[in-house]
Structures are given as structure tokens and as C-alpha cells.
């Protein structure tokens, strides 16, 4: 499977545990393409939620369903970054346009103080 940055996939994040994201939900690949193309078995992603109220949180990015092919309007939660096995990514949903990825990158820089 060829995985690219800015793609959205469904992933099983496992059972709920504290405040960690869980269950089957969409994730946005944020790892760079050279790493995606490498022999690494893992991928870094940001969790996507349909709780659009989280768009008000600094750094989070609103994703319109019409732009991403998600079933409903959603939000990239830049504070919910996960490392997954590439095999945990199942159905490809779509891709985040460059303009919104720029906002995601800005949010990641903010939350990680880069």
C-alpha cells in the first residue's frame, strides 16, 4: 500500500482509554512522503473528529465534508497525534487540499512549538 501525506484513511484506534482517541475513526497522514515510502512499518497521523465544536480550539482545522469526501464535516485535532502500523490504515477516504494542509501544518507547529 502506498500512503501519502495529506491522505485520509479509516483506522481502528482500539478500545477507549482515558482521553486517548479510540474506536474506528478517520485519520490524516501527516508524516512526510520520504518516510511513507521507506521501509518503516509505521505512519504518523492526526486524528479527525466529527465534533466540529473542536474547530474552535487553537490549531485545529475544520474540514468540510464536500472537500474531503468524509461522511460529514469534521475537524483535524492537532493535539491527537498517533503512530500507527501502516496495516492499521484501512479504507482511503480522500485527501486534504493543499490550502487546508497548510493550516494543519501551522496548527502542528503551534502545538509542538516548532
UniProtKB/Swiss-Prot annotation:
It comes from the Bacteria. Keywords: Endonuclease, Hydrolase, Nuclease, Secreted, Toxin-antitoxin system. Induction: Strongly induced (17 to 25-fold) by nitrosative stress, starvation, when grown in a non-replicating state, in the presence of gentamycin or rifampicin. Signal peptide: none annotated. One of its GO terms (cellular component) is extracellular region. SUPFAM superfamilies: Cell growth inhibitor/plasmid maintenance toxic component (SSF50118). The keyword Secreted applies. Disruption phenotype: Individual deletion of mazF3, mazF6 and mazF9 have little to no phenotype, but a triple mutant shows increased sensitivity to oxidative and antibiotic stress and starvation, decreased formation of persisters cells, and a decreased bacterial load and pathogenic damage in infected guinea pigs. GO terms for molecular function: DNA binding; RNA endonuclease activity; RNA nuclease activity. Its EC number is 3.1.27.-. GO terms for biological process: mRNA catabolic process; negative regulation of growth; positive regulation of growth; rRNA catabolic process; symbiont-mediated perturbation of host process. It is found in: Secreted. InterPro entries: PemK-like, Plasmid_toxin/cell-grow_inhib. The keyword Lipid biosynthesis does not apply. Forms a complex with cognate toxin MazE6, which neutralizes the toxin. Interacts physically with non-cognate antitoxins VapB27 and VapB40 which neutralize the toxin. Belongs to the PemK/MazF family. Toxic component of a type II toxin-antitoxin (TA) system. Upon expression in E.coli and in M.smegmatis partially inhibits cell growth and colony formation; its toxic effect is neutralized by coexpression with cognate antitoxin MazE6. Acts as an mRNA interferase on ssRNA, cleaving between the second and third bases in the sequences CUCCU and UUCCU. This is Endoribonuclease MazF6.
Amino acid at each position: 500500500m502506498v500512503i501519502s501525506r495529506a491522505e485520509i484513511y479509516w483506522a481502528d484506534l482500539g478500545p477507549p482509554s482515558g482521553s486517548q482517541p479510540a474506536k474506528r475513526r478517520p485519520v490524516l497522514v501527516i508524516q512526510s512522503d520520504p518516510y511513507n515510502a521507506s521501509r518503516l512499518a509505521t505512519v504518523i497521523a492526526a486524528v479527525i473528529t466529527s465534533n466540529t465544536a473542536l474547530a474552535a480550539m487553537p490549531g485545529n482545522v475544520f474540514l468540510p465534508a464536500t472537500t474531503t469526501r468524509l461522511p460529514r464535516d469534521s475537524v483535524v485535532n492537532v493535539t491527537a497525534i498517533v503512530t500507527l502500523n501502516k496495516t492499521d490504515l484501512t479504507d482511503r477516504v480522500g485527501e486534504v487540499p493543499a490550502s487546508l494542509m497548510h493550516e494543519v501544518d501551522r496548527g502542528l507547529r503551534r502545538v509542538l512549538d516548532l
